[in-house]
Amino acid sequence: MTDPEDAVAGTAEDLVADARSLGAPASTRMVKDWVEHGLLARPQFRKTTQRGSDPGLFAREQRVLFRKILEAKRRSPLPRVPHHTVVPLIISMWLNDDRVITDDQARRALRTYARSAGARSHASRTATARAVIDQFAHPEASKQTRRSVERLLLDGEKSRRPRWDTLVPAMKDLAAPWRHDADGLARLDARTIGLPESPVTFDYAVGLWMVKGEVTQQLERESIPPKALLLAREEFRRGWAEYQNDRAALAARGGESAALFTEPTGWEAKVREHVDSFATTLGRVAGLAEPIFDEVRAGLRRR
C-alpha cells in the first residue's frame, strides 16, 4: 500500500511490507507487539480449511492507522518513540468515535497508558504533589506544613492507602489556617480554586488525585468491567463536548483560576488533557470514587 486511499484489509506480512516501503524497520513480531500494547486491533480470524486457517486480516482502518503512526514516528526528533507516547492518541480517538479503534484495542491501550502513569519517577510525582500544593497553599502556610503535606501525598499515592486521619488535618492547615479578623476574632480562612459558585477545596482536589491513582491501578490490572468503560465513555463524550463549548466562558469568569479552563497549546497537550480527564468520569462510573471520598469526609469529621 503506497496511498492510504488505496488501502484494503491486510495481513501482518502486508503491514510489514507497508512499513518497509516507508523505510521503517519492521517484522511480524513488531506487529504482534503493537497489538499487545493497543496500538493496533487484533486481526480478524479467517478459517479457510477444516483443519487450519489463513493469517488474520487487519481491517482497512487499522492498516491506515499503522501507516500514520509510522509516519508520525519518523517525524519525531526522538531516536526511539516508546509505545506510551503513542497510546494517548489511540485512547483519544476511541473516546471521540467508534469508527477506527475497537473496544478491545482501547482496553489494551488503556492498560499500556496506566502502566506508564504508574511507573512515573519520584521527581515527577514530587512535581505533581508540589503543583497541587501551590494551587491551594495559603500565603501564611509554613514551609514545614508544605513539606508535611508533600510527604503525606507522596506516601499516599505510592501505597494507594492514604493516611486520611493525618492527611486531611494537614491539608486544612495548609489551605485554611486560623486567622484573626480586625476585631481579634478567630476565623477559618479557607482557600479554594475554580468558579465562585462551585469552588474546589483542597481536600476535594486531593480526593480526585487519589481517584485517578486508583483508576490507573485498576486499568493496569484490567479489572474495570468492559461495560463500565463503555458507560463512562458515553457519559464523558457528552460532558467533554459541553465543556469544550463552555470553557472560554468559564475561563472569562474564572478570575485567578482562569488558567484551569484555558485550552492547552499543541495537539499533544490537548490529547493528554482529553485522556487524563476521562479518569475522573471512569472512577465515578466504575464505583471507585465514592469509597475514596467517604474516607476524605470521615477524615474531615475527625479533625
Regions found by a protein language model. Name each.
Residues 2, 46-303:
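Arg/Lys-rich, alpha-helical DNA-contact motif
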Residues 1-40, 113-114:
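Polyanion-binding surface elements
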Residues 42-44:
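Short acidic/His/Gly/Ser-rich catalytic and metal-binding motifs that mark active-site loops
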